[in-house]
Structure formats: C-alpha cells, structure tokens
Amino acid sequence: MKLIVGLGNPGREYAATRHNAGAWWVVRLADQLGVTLKADGKFHGLCARIGQGESESWLLNPQTYMNASGRAVAALCRFYRIQPEQMLVVHDELDLPPGVSRLKLDGGLGGHNGLKDIVAHLGTREFWRLRIGIGHPGEKHAVVNYVLQPPRKEEAALIDTAINDSLEVWPLIAEGNYQAAMMRLHTQKQS
C-alpha cells in the first residue's frame, strides 16, 4: 500500500462530524506509527511519509472539501507515481451500522461524493476502500444533515470500536495480505 487517504472535511466546524470518520482513522494510524501529518500545499492536504525506499508510503488527509477530494489524491498519486490499486481510501459508510468496518477493492460509490470525485480524477474505481460504518438516518433527504453532524455518544463509541478493529488489521493491509485482513476484519465480533 503506497497511499492511505482519510476522507473528511477541513475545519474545526467539521472535525467531529460523521463524514470525517476516514480522516479520524488516518490521524489514529499516524499516531500509532509515530508520525505527524503536516500541511502540504502541493498535495492540498495533511501528509506524512511512512517507511523509506521501496517500503515508502504516504498518509493523506485532503484539506479540500469532501466533494473535491480527488484533486488532492490525484496530485499525490501523479507526483509519486502511485497506481490506484496501491491506494487505500478510508471513508464513512452510510450502509454499515456504527461499529462495523469493511475492506474491499473496487465497487460502487454509494452516493459518496468524496469517492465520486476521486474516481473522476483517477478515471477508475480500482482502489481499496476501508468503509467505516456510521449508520443511515433512515430517510434519504436527511443524509446531508446526518453526515455533517457529530455522532451521538453511543454511536461515537461504536465508530471508535470500528476504527480500533480496523487499525488492528493495518499490518496485514500494509504487507499486501488483503484476504487475511478482510477475513479477520469481517469475522471479528462487531458491536
């Protein structure tokens, strides 16, 4: 894995919202790895390098708004010649309940504007996704307000569990052992 992207919106007013679950995950991974995400205007985001040489990878939290995430992702991919299939995009997922996370390659976009913009910039859906469940408000018209609100206390605890569970399989993802990562993540007892 050469690039790990955490989707979210920049700014304090969005920091605690459900839509930032992907960004939360990347911040936690950076902490776990002992690196600091730093602003990089060239890549329109907060970045950190992990590893060196052949094992070099990048963490990126775009600081564009969600709907323009592809600009940041494409800039870093072009500069470091990273292929889409070498990338993991971590994002909030309405179709999974809080407490559940799932890893997959390719697939639909589920109406997620951050994913849509990445696909528009890269011209492919062939990249890995780590989907962090945030639940669904029940009504389609309520989705925008729902994702831009902080989770309730009990939901926040479940989302935190999903982030912890998926961080436990990070070493498998990092070494390219995706099947083992999926097996472990998808069969863990999820709350």
UniProtKB/Swiss-Prot annotation:
Active-site residue numbers: 19
Site residues (Stabilizes the basic form of H active site to accept a proton), renumbered to this chain: 92
CDD domains cross-referenced by the UniProt entry: PTH (cd00462)
Known EC number: 3.1.1.29
UniProt subcellular location: Cytoplasm
InterPro entries: Pept_tRNA_hydro, Pept_tRNA_hydro_CS, Pept_tRNA_hydro_sf
Site positions (Discriminates between blocked and unblocked aminoacyl-tRNA): 9
Residues that bind tRNA: 14, 65, 67, 113
Name of the molecule in the record: Peptidyl-tRNA hydrolase
PROSITE patterns per the UniProt record, alphabetical: PEPT_TRNA_HYDROL_2
Function: Hydrolyzes ribosome-free peptidyl-tRNAs (with 1 or more amino acids incorporated), which drop off the ribosome during protein synthesis, or as a result of ribosome stalling. Catalyzes the release of premature peptidyl moieties from peptidyl-tRNA molecules trapped in stalled 50S ribosomal subunits, and thus maintains levels of free tRNAs and 50S ribosomes.
Key words of the record: Cytoplasm, Hydrolase, RNA-binding, tRNA-binding
Protein family membership: Belongs to the PTH family.
SUPFAM superfamilies: Peptidyl-tRNA hydrolase-like
GO molecular function annotations of the record: peptidyl-tRNA hydrolase activity; tRNA binding
Subunit note: Monomer.
PANTHER family: PEPTIDYL-TRNA HYDROLASE (PTHR17224:SF1)
Domain of life: Bacteria
GO biological processes: protein quality control for misfolded or incompletely synthesized proteins; rescue of stalled ribosome
Keyword RNA-binding (UniProt): yes
One Pfam entry name: Pept_tRNA_hydro
Catalytic reaction(s) noted: an N-acyl-L-alpha-aminoacyl-tRNA + H2O = an N-acyl-L-amino acid + a tRNA + H(+)
Annotated NCBIfam families: pth
Gene Ontology cellular component annotations, sorted alphabetically: cytoplasm
